[in-house]
UniProtKB/Swiss-Prot annotation:
<comment type="pathway">
    <text>Cofactor biosynthesis; pyridoxine 5'-phosphate biosynthesis; pyridoxine 5'-phosphate from D-erythrose 4-phosphate: step 5/5.</text>
</comment>
<dbReference type="GO" id="GO:0005829">
    <property type="term" value="C:cytosol"/>
</dbReference>
<keyword id="KW-0808">Transferase</keyword>
<feature type="binding site">
    <location>
        <position position="45"/>
    </location>
    <ligand>
        <name>1-deoxy-D-xylulose 5-phosphate</name>
    </ligand>
</feature>
<keyword id="KW-0664">Pyridoxine biosynthesis</keyword>
<feature type="site" description="Transition state stabilizer">
    <location>
        <position position="151"/>
    </location>
</feature>
<feature type="binding site">
    <location>
        <position position="50"/>
    </location>
    <ligand>
        <name>1-deoxy-D-xylulose 5-phosphate</name>
    </ligand>
</feature>
<protein>
    <recommendedName>
        <fullName>Pyridoxine 5'-phosphate synthase</fullName>
        <ecNumber>2.6.99.2</ecNumber>
    </recommendedName>
</protein>
<dbReference type="GO" id="GO:0008615">
    <property type="term" value="P:pyridoxine biosynthetic process"/>
</dbReference>
<comment type="similarity">
    <text>Belongs to the PNP synthase family.</text>
</comment>
<comment type="function">
    <text>Catalyzes the complicated ring closure reaction between the two acyclic compounds 1-deoxy-D-xylulose-5-phosphate (DXP) and 3-amino-2-oxopropyl phosphate (1-amino-acetone-3-phosphate or AAP) to form pyridoxine 5'-phosphate (PNP) and inorganic phosphate.</text>
</comment>
<feature type="binding site">
    <location>
        <begin position="213"/>
        <end position="214"/>
    </location>
    <ligand>
        <name>3-amino-2-oxopropyl phosphate</name>
    </ligand>
</feature>
<comment type="subunit">
    <text>Homooctamer; tetramer of dimers.</text>
</comment>
<feature type="binding site">
    <location>
        <position position="18"/>
    </location>
    <ligand>
        <name>3-amino-2-oxopropyl phosphate</name>
    </ligand>
</feature>
<dbReference type="InterPro" id="IPR004569">
    <property type="entry name" value="PyrdxlP_synth_PdxJ"/>
</dbReference>
<dbReference type="Pfam" id="PF03740">
    <property type="entry name" value="PdxJ"/>
</dbReference>
<feature type="active site" description="Proton acceptor">
    <location>
        <position position="70"/>
    </location>
</feature>
Amino acid sequence: MAKLGVNIDHVATIRQARGGVEPDPVAAAAIAELAGADGITIHLREDRRHIQDRDLKLLRQTVKTRLNLEMAATDEMVNIAISVKPDMCTLVPEKRQELTTEGGLDVRLNLESIKEAVQRLQDGGLIVSLFIDPDPDQIKAADKTGADYIEIHTGAFAEARDWKSEQAELAKIENAIKLAGKLGMGINAGHGLNYANIRKVAALGGIEEYNIGHSIISKAVLVGLDRAVRDMVDLVKYA
């Protein structure tokens, strides 16, 4: 049965919009866990635009399920991860001007630097995942780094505007699942997944955990976080 990791970055985004102390992502994480989330995901960006160092440290102390830290493959972030010790580190690309992560890591182009970051994190006792597009060359490169997991970037599927394009993207995801499985890598997925499209990806099988944030927080504004998480748990686990 697949798991749901709830990304709470946008709780911090709302807090930072006013520079205050609420809503607190630490409290949101507790509610998400009580509602059935299997894990909590956060992205500590280099520019600290939403999640802050304080949040990471408190979440490490309070999260009862699993804490997944999305991070750039920089010396600063690697050192922070080794110090705080989340349950998983997911290496993601990062651009200061982007509103959200726009694509997967180019592991082929940056193989040596990513491999070094993976090794340092693993030497620190951490499980490492790479956020990549469902591209066979990127998956093979990810395997060469020694990473434990890949997280399939589902953004292109989520943004498909017609049935033909959607089916083509689903086929890429399905092939990525098969290839990563053959290579012995764990498989997660995320980006752009919502209440309307998650069943289509979940029906493929083979994915261990879905990391979903924006759609859950958007629904939470209307119906509350507990209800929003419970509804997504039902879709992920019983697709």
